[in-house]
């Protein structure tokens, strides 16, 4: 039985790859075709662009939120992890939805490899940091879709 407040595996979710300048956003559902990149949200000195996040939330109406947890290879804490956890808490407070954290190690590398394949196939024209951030968010959602039991419910 899932933890109280956990996200149903068949639910639509928004996933986030949190960076210091941009947040990649993806949408996914187990009933659909995995996950897809949908937006990149700018982060300013005073935090994320909440107006843009509100628009994405309103458009997709997710049942839960999946935030990449940037663990180091030796499972140590780092500033990026603190930033991701703070963002996850803000999401939970703002949208009153369950928020889970999932290991995002190597998600940017996987996103870059996907981008390179799409470029080689002629589906992408040039390397674009925004596209990579959103694609990394799609990788994060796909990890949750394939193994939701490995996610940690935000305390």
Swiss-Prot record:
Name the record gives this protein: Putative pre-16S rRNA nuclease
Entry's EC annotation: 3.1.-.-
Pfam families in the cross-refs: RuvX (PF03652)
GO cellular component: cytosol
Family: Belongs to the YqgF nuclease family.
SUPFAM superfamilies, alphabetized: Ribonuclease H-like
PANTHER family attached to this UniProt entry: POLYNUCLEOTIDYL TRANSFERASE, RIBONUCLEASE H-LIKE SUPERFAMILY PROTEIN (PTHR33317:SF4)
């Amino acid at each position: 039985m899932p933890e109280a407040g956990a996200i149903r595996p068949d639910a639509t979710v928004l996933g986030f790859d949190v960076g210091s300048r941009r947040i990649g956003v993806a949408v996914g559902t187990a009933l659909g075709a995995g996950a897809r990149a949908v937006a990149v949200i700018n982060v300013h000195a005073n935090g994320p662009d909440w107006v843009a996040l509100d628009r994405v939330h309103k458009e997709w109406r997710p049942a839960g939120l999946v935030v990449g947890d940037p663990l180091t290879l030796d499972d140590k804490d780092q500033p990026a992890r603190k930033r991701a956890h703070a963002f996850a808490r803000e999401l939970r407070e703002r949208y009153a939805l369950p928020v889970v954290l999932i290991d995002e190690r190597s998600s940017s590398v996987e996103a870059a490899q996907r981008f390179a394949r799409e470029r080689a196939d002629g589906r992408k024209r040039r390397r674009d940091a925004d596209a990579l951030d959103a694609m990394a968010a799609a990788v994060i959602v796909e990890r949750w879709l394939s193994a939701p039991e490995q996610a940690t419910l935000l305390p």
